[in-house]
C-alpha cells in the first residue's frame, strides 16, 4: 500500500525552504507518518477539538461525531440510548453519524475504543452560531455598555454555551517570540473548549456574539451554542483555506511573497512585519 505523505505536509510549506527538501521538523513528520502507517499506532482514541463537555450539537441535522484512534480499532459511540460503531480507516480516522434530533438535553455522549473510554457530559442539542470577524467581534462583553451588570446576570442563561477560540497572541504592535512563531507555523492559532455561560466564561467573550445568542435563545426557546473565532485586523484572505487560494486564478498570487505583495493591504503587511520580526523563515 502507498503511504500518504502529502496530507500532513501540505499545510507546511515553511518546512521546504527550497520547495523540495524538508528541514529537520519536516523529516520528523515524514518519519512519524511512516511509523504510524506501519504500526497503526496513531496515539489512541482522540476526539476533534470541538467535542468537549458542555458542547451544543446542531438540532434538526444529522449529528456527526469524529476523531482518530489506532488503525483498525473498533470505535463505539453511545448517544441518547443509541449505540453505533465503526472501524477506523488505515489512517486511524473515524466518523459516526446519528439521526437528526430535536432540541433538548442535557445528555451524555460515550466514546469507546479498544483501549480507552471517553464520556462527554452536560451536552445540549440546539442551534450553533459561528461568530467570526475582526476586533469588533472580539470586543469583550465586560467592556461594553452595562457590561459589568450583564456579566453578573450571565449565569441565568443556562441554555447558552460558549466556545471561545483564544488566539496564541494578539496581532498587536510587538514582535512575537519563538514559541508563538513555532505554533503559528504549526497552524496552532487557537485553543479552547465549550463552557457553560457564567460570570467567568462570559466576561471576555464577544459582546456582539453574546447579545445575539441571548436574543436567539429567548426568541427561539432553544439552546444556543456560540463559537467565537475573531482576530483583530485580520483580512478576509486569512479566513480562506490554502487549497481554495491555490486553485483560484484571482487570488493565487496572494501566496507569492505575500509580505511584499500589493494584493495585501499595506497596514496588514506592516503589522505582519512587526509580528514576524524574529522569524527565521523570511517567506
Feature map (PLM): residue ranges:
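Catalytic His-Asp segment of secreted/periplasmic serine-dependent ester chemistry enzymes
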Residues: 1-42
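Cell-envelope and extracellular/periplasmic
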Residues: 1, 7-10, 41-283
